[in-house]
Amino acid sequence: MNILILGGSGILSTDFTKMCLDKGNVVYTLNRGNRTHFIDPRVKLIKADLRNEPENVLREKIFKEIPSYDVIVDFLSFIPDHLKRTLSILNGQFIQFIFISSSTAYRKKCEDEILTEQSEIGNEKWDYAYNKYLCEEFLKKCSINYTIIRPYVTYGKNRIPFPIIPGDQYTLLARIMANKPVIMFEQGDAICTLTHTEDFAKTLYELLLNEKAYKEAFHITSTSAQPWLEVYTILCELLNRKPKICSLDRAETEKYMPEFYEILVGDKGTNMRFDNTKVSNAIGHSVYNTVSLRDGLKQSVDFFMNNSYMQKIDYKFDGECDYIAAKISKQKCCILESPVRRNKDVLYYHIMRFPLTNYLVRAKRAKKMDSK
């Protein structure tokens, strides 16, 4: 097959790209080429900015070598305008178009619901989820062989799955290793379904040019589920540390960490369980579930610990967590150590760790300036 992957260097698309290559396909990936660590050297890289380059320029780059593709997989569309532009550029020059949506688009009726593809969609509690739903609605009106894929929380060697975690995910591991408290939502009791990217890739691959997948939507998830607290406990065991949490309820989360409020009340702070019968029927067997949670998390931890370029610390997040831990559970902590810590990192930490003090200092300085 000639396969075009829009993306190809993210956590979800990297293992899928590898799977397609390992199966002997010709794989093109379109991305900006910035994350060279995660771009497989076997791919035919189309270096382009899908959001900002003119459509005619992008079309010329995409179809420079071949006039059409068997399958195009879109990991990059997050809002309907993205999808509309992408399909305009592609101009129907493919057999199957696969849109990577999200299982967060489901609009759950209750915490005990086992989600199927017939469950209601349109989760209005989180903008990301609702926009994925809007993308799906747009795609369903298109006269193409589309397939909608709804992954849930996926993880792999370069992603640590956790509900409250910054973009620089090593920060979480660093806090655990430093015996600092980790912020959890409602004791970490919410049930999560975590899917390793290798297992996701195997199932998705079997939907390529599968006529049972045309004009259909599927979620692809693991068959096991566990509370988030168990995920944290395993991480602590892998790092040879004892668990130490600071739990926030819903009101405290909205007050102290509003940037995480939507994703928690609309997704990761709720129970998420799935029935994979539909996709299993389409591929003729059960979904792949070959990587255990412990083995998958060990793979992630080892990758972060063995690659210095992954060991970035978000000192704003570190300071924010220490402020909350001191405020809520009276646990006092110091800034994380790092051989590459900069002066501005220390400043960021202290601004977040001592917000009231910094506010008063700034107010005092402003008053002095006004008096001059």
Describe each model-derived feature in a short phrase:
Residues 30-34:
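N-terminal Rossmann-fold cofactor-binding loop
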Residues 67-114, 119, 123, 130-141:
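NAD(P)-cofactor binding segment of oxidoreductase domains
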Residues 47-68, 81-82:
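Conserved Rossmann-fold cofactor-binding substructure of NAD(P)-dependent oxidoreductases
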Residues 206-264, 276, 299, 310, ...:
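Mid/C-terminal beta-alpha module of Rossmann-like enzyme folds, strongest
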Residues 3-23:
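N-terminal Rossmann NAD(P)H-binding glycine-rich loop of SDR-like oxidoreductase domains
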Residues 113-136, 153, 162-170, 193-194, ...:
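Short-chain dehydrogenase/reductase
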